[in-house]
Amino acid sequence: INYDSYRKPINSYDRKNRVLGKSKDELYPYYGATGQIGFIDDFLFNGEYILLGEDAAPFLDKKAQKAYMIKGKSWVNNHAHILQSLVFPEYLTNCLNSIDYFDYVYGTTRLKLTQENMNRILVPVPSIEEQCKIAQAINNLFVLIESIKASLS
């Protein structure tokens, strides 16, 4: 389910003024194409969502994250598509991070994934049990990678 129509763009100047003098517990995460980029004094969304970069995401970098999950109250800017999954969310997020976006994005200096092109992306949908197994196996591999990285530093 796509919630892009609920996004409200806000420039950095206005966002900065809205948080001025507010305590951390009065603020909500503010997300963009590749992750949290700050805080704001209001929220547009409350739930579990998958965010997929619309522009400014590293679409052609096979190792880079293009989609990520958020939970709770938040504000998402107009540089990320906002999705709620009808399948296991971790599975869909992993699928969206493994897709070759070459045929779905356009632009020379700043690649863009339009909603129309995003809707053309086909994701295999096995049973929910299989989705859970796949997502858990991928998560276990990421934990192993982080463990190895930590032991090397």
What do the predicted segments below correspond to?
Residues I1-G32, P124-S153:
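Non-catalytic DNA-recognition/assembly elements of restriction-modification systems
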Residues T34-G38:
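Short alpha-helical segments and helix-capping/turn motifs at coil-helix boundaries
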Residues D41-D42, D61:
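Cytochrome P450 core scaffold surrounding the K-helix E-X-X-R motif
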Residues F45-E48:
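Short Gly/aromatic-enriched secondary-structure transition segments
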Residues E54:
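Short beta-strand/turn segments that mark the catalytic/cofactor-handling region
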Residues A57-V125:
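Basic, amphipathic alpha-helical recognition segments used for DNA target recognition
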